[in-house]
């Protein structure tokens, strides 16, 4: 870096924009290659600023040579492939392998060469995260080719590697194919048509006749089978002896007698004679292959001609008649057992089926019984809190009664109005009387409470003494009882607490209404006479609708204007301690003001501590070392 001046750095930055390149290190060097002779270095004529760069676009490392003598920009670059190895042959000469040959870098300054070597060998420390996670890095093509050559690939068509691979697909069973072909042509003669006609007739005869019919032609096979074996040895002479083979036909009747004896014995042994012939008929019709499967019978079919074609079908019953008797009983037994066995399984299936319904009925009954029992108490439980809604619905009624009370007083029906008031505010009066007992003490200490006291004590006085100030009481009652009835509706048990808390504020309001900043009770007494006029004004205000009266009553219940405090306006314009610290102002005046008031003392100390911590933090400056060369680039 000592060889590069500011102008050279500007050229490098223009050639390697910061948006797409992260320059890790730069030095001055020359490029040499060992080509075409691997044992001799050749100067390429390229020299300039050699930069180790992390490409932010491709997320790979590059060695790029920038022209600093001219304006050609990047004149050479080499991507650092996978497992890139960087060697130091000399302190001033470093080498690495490229695809075609080796390359060498000749450095001007040895210190810069050693520094550049460390950066290249530990390049992962300065790499971008995406570069480290890049799995698509390029490998050296030369090494890839060598690895591919060293590996033997056995593909599906690897004939070059295995010369005799196709020979394994050659079949040696060619001799069997012509034999089957020689045996196949004889069947085509026109006898096939007669065979079809005779076969159909034989099937009709078999279906029409009883068990005796299939037994008569049955013995034809035994004599035919030995002759067929003799003919197989001389297949060419099988055609002329056909007329001679018809002669042994009378011999089978000698053998027919025992099968005839067997035939009637079978129906006698089997109680069901009809299914027996049906079974061999179906087997003979469905399975004609057992005869042609052996080659002897297949060859005999053309030689024997029609009589053999008529007899293979009944031959099945001969062979099948002997094993057939056992199958029918098996089928009958299986059928009987099948009919009987599936019959019992349904009942067990039906057996478990009924239990679910009883469970369901039982559960339904239990649920109904339990639900009915549970719903009843729930209904009763829900009916328990139901009473509160009536008082909510009856909220307008007390207002109406309260508005009707003055008329009743004017009509001299005070006893009736008294009853309604006692019914509406029966729970609240006790706490009101207690607060009224407190109010005379306050008034006795202050003096001149004569006018306001009857206004405050009109609620209990009406409960005790009816003939007190007819016009004011209804208004005061409307104001005092409305807030009581409003909270009393939702929760009856809390009525005494709410009513006990509600009445005290009105005296406080009457005593503190003229006051603007005095919280304690003693100052109001001298200003009490003014409450008569304010009380008159309040009576004029309460003659409006019930909602406004309720709002005024709630304000009075909260303490009224007396609950407000005076604040020094000089402190409103002053910012907090943190703002003063941020602006650089001294925090001593507000701290002193905060200490002057008892509630402002603790927050002032906390604010001072926080401000001091912020100031200490500002003074601390973390020094970031960019590995001794990162700030320049």
UniProtKB/Swiss-Prot annotation:
The modification Phosphothreonine is found at residue 334. Residues 192-215, 257-269, 307-322, 479-488 have a biased composition (Low complexity). It comes from the Eukaryota. Residues 216-225, 238-256, 342-357 have a biased composition (Pro residues). GO terms for cellular component: actin cortical patch; cytoplasm; mating projection tip; SLAC complex. Residues 363-376, 399-414, 454-465 have a biased composition (Polar residues). One of its GO terms (biological process) is regulation of actin filament polymerization. GO terms for molecular function: actin binding; Arp2/3 complex binding; small GTPase binding. Disulfide bonds: none annotated. SUPFAM superfamilies: PH domain-like. Interacts with KRE6, LSB3, LSB5 and YSC84. This is Proline-rich protein LAS17. The gene is LAS17.
């Amino acid at each position: 870096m000592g060889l590069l001046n500011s102008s050279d750095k500007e050229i490098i930055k223009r050639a390697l924009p910061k948006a797409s390149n992260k320059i890790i290190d730069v030095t001055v060097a020359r490029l040499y290659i060992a080509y075409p002779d691997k044992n001799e270095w050749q100067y390429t004529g390229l020299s300039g600023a050699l930069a180790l760069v992390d490409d932010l676009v491709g997320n790979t490392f590059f060695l790029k040579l920038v022209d600093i003598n001219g304006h050609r920009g990047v004149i050479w670059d080499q991507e650092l492939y996978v497992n890139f190895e960087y060697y130091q042959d000399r302190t001033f000469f470093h080498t690495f392998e490229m695809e075609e040959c080796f390359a060498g870098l000749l450095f001007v300054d040895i210190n810069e060469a050693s520094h550049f070597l460390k950066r290249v060998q530990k390049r992962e420390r300065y790499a971008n995260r995406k570069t480290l996670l890049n799995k698509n890095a390029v490998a050296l093509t030369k090494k890839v080719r060598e690895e591919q050559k060293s590996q033997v690939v056995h593909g599906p068509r690897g004939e070059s590697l295995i010369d005799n691979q196709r020979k394994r697909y050659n079949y040696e069973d060619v001799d069997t194919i012509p034999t089957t072909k020689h045996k196949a042509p004889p069947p085509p003669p026109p006898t096939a048509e007669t065979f079809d006609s005779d076969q159909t007739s034989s099937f009709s005869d078999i279906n029409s006749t009883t068990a005796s019919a299939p037994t008569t032609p049955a013995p034809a096979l035994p004599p035919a089978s030995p002759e067929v074996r003799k003919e197989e040895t001389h297949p060419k002479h099988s055609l002329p002896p056909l007329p001679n083979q018809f002669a042994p036909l009378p011999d089978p009747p000698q053998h027919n007698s025992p099968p005839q004896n067997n035939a009637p014995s079978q129906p006698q042994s089997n109680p069901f004679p009809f299914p027996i012939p049906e079974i061999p008929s179906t087997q003979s019709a469905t399975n004609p292959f057992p005869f042609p499967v052996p080659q002897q019978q297949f060859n005999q079919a053309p030689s024997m001609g029609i009589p053999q074609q008529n007899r293979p079908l009944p031959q099945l019953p001969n062979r099948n008649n002997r094993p057939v008797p056992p199958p029918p009983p098996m089928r009958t037994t299986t059928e009987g057992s099948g009919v009987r066995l599936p019959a019992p399984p349904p009942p067990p299936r039906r057996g478990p089926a009924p239990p679910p319904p009883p469970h369901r009925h039982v559960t339904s009954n239990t649920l109904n019984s339990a639900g009915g029992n549970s719903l009843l108490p729930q209904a009763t439980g829900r009916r328990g809190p139901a009473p509160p809604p009536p008082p909510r619905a009856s909220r307008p009624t007390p207002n109406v009664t309260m508005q009707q009370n003055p008329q009743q007083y004017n009509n001299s029906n005070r006893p009736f109005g008294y009853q309604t008031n006692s019914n509406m505010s029966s729970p609240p009066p006790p706490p009101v009387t207690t607060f009224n007992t407190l109010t005379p003490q306050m008034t006795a200490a202050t003096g001149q409470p004569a006018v306001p006291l009857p206004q405050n004590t009109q609620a209990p006085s009406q409960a005790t003494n009816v003939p007190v100030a007819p016009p004011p009481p209804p208004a005061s009652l409307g104001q005092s009882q409305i807030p009581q009835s409003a909270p009393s509706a939702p929760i009856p048990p809390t009525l005494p607490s709410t009513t006990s808390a509600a009445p005290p504020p009105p005296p406080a309001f009457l005593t503190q209404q003229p006051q603007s900043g005095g919280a304690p009770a003693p100052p109001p007494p001298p200003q009490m006479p003014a409450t008569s006029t304010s009380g008159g004004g309040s009576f004029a205000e309460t003659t409006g609708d019930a909602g406004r009266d309720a709002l005024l009553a709630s304000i009075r219940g909260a303490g009224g204007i007396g609950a407000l405090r005076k604040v020094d306006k000089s402190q409103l314009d002053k910012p907090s301690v943190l703002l003063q610290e941020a602006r650089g102002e001294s925090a001593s005046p507000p701290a002193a003001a905060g200490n002057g008031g008892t509630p402002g003392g603790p927050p002032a100390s906390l604010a001072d501590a926080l401000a001091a911590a912020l100031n200490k933090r500002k003074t601390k400056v973390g020094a970031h070392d960019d590995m001794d060369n990162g700030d320049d680039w």
